[in-house]
Amino acid sequence: MLDSGASKRHVDMFMQQLEENGLPKPDLCILTHNHWDHTYGLAHLENVTSFATKSTNELLKKMQAWGWSDEEMKNRIETGEASAFSYPHLNLEYPDKSMIKIAPATVEYTDKLTIDLGGVTVKLKEIENSHSYDCAVAYIPEEKCIFLGDIHYEDLLPVQPAYYADSHAKLISGLRKFDFDKVLSGHQMLMSNVDLYAQLANVETV
């Protein structure tokens, strides 16, 4: 399972789709970065070993202590801890903030990690980027497929979201070290490597 979704509702929907398609429940989950829409479902996964970068886990542990009053959420936006872009979406998913449950991953790593699934491997790798400093990709060499999470998106914390020239260049350089032709991400349909690099080339950086 690549990322855990935003909530118990997401996890339940995912499990229902697996059941309807005759597929087994996952026993592994990989987190690509700390943002709530990719991680807050983790607490609702049962009998699953999860993986995250050390940076992601540190951020999730910090979030476990967060309060969710309107004032506390507003303060986190003002201090740059959270994105003004994301909170309206979080409010829709969680009208009752007491339902927010946050769990860190069971296994953490730094820089890179290879998971052997038996005939198929998943290579996890941190790459510098604009979106969030803890981002990592998941690459399956046997399938020539890479899962990006949100690593190819801009930083949403500033009032004006931004791609940073140096970090963006390092992202492209880091991705070119992988031989892939299929690209999956957190918020887009399946695309080719050609589509991805065209998208990355067509952004304004600061």
Stretches with model-predicted labels:
Residues 61-125:
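Metallo-beta-lactamase
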Residues 51, 139, 166-206:
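Divalent-metal (often Zn2+) His-rich catalytic cores of metallo-beta-lactamase-fold enzymes
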Residues 1-19, 137-150:
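Conserved beta-strand hairpin/beta-sheet module of binuclear metal-dependent hydrolase folds
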Residues 3-6, 33-34, 55-56, 127-129, ...:
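Active-site metal-binding loops of divalent metal-dependent hydrolases
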Residues 9-55, 176-183:
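Active-site metal-binding motif and surrounding structural segment of the metallo-beta-lactamase
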Residues 6, 158-163, 194-198:
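Short, solvent-exposed loop/turn segments at secondary-structure boundaries
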Residues 121-175:
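Active-site-proximal loop/helix segments of hydrolase catalytic cores
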